[in-house]
Amino acid sequence: PSAVNPNAEIYAKLGIPFVMGTTGGDREALARTLADSGLYAVISPNMGKQIVALQSMLTQAARDFPGAWSGYTMKVTESHQSTKVDTSGTAKALVECFQGLGLKFDVSEIELLREHQGQLAFGVPQDHLDSGHAFHTYTLTSPDGSVVFEFKHNVCGRRTYAEGSVDACLFLKSQIDAGSEQRVFSMQDILRAGALS
């Protein structure tokens, strides 16, 4: 996360369009760097296309149905390889969507699994404990416990992020070639354009 802004500044100085998938850095400074340079870029907190689509759907649901899950409780558990020290940006973003749907939940309540024993019990395959995984479960329970909703997105490896990154590069190239007035894009822009391989 600490390399986000210095890297963007280097790209801007050299005039190199770029794709960056991160939840880190100073977003306001990043926006200023891009605006000042006029550089083309795709910046997204998540490069997994389907995960971005899920987040977009929940964001829209929060706009369309505010308070739909008022009174429900929520439990969020996320697991990543032990080298990840911070809370998942994707989990934080989805919690924000659920808050819009009426759930009272703070991101500090997200349960982080970084130890192998807990990860295995959570369903992470042995082969992906240290080589890369992102498992998330959001459980919503009605006040009387009679209704439970569960949302999950589990990723083993890095392929889905690599595929999204390739799509982002191809999309960015097409926007540059077309002389697009818009210079900074997100994965949502790519999904809306149907620019998927």
Spans of features found by a protein language model:
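Short, surface-exposed acidic/glycine-rich loop or hinge patches that mediate macromolecular interfaces
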Residues: 2, 24, 48, 81-84, ...
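Rossmann-fold NAD(P)-binding glycine/threonine-rich loop
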Residues: 3-64
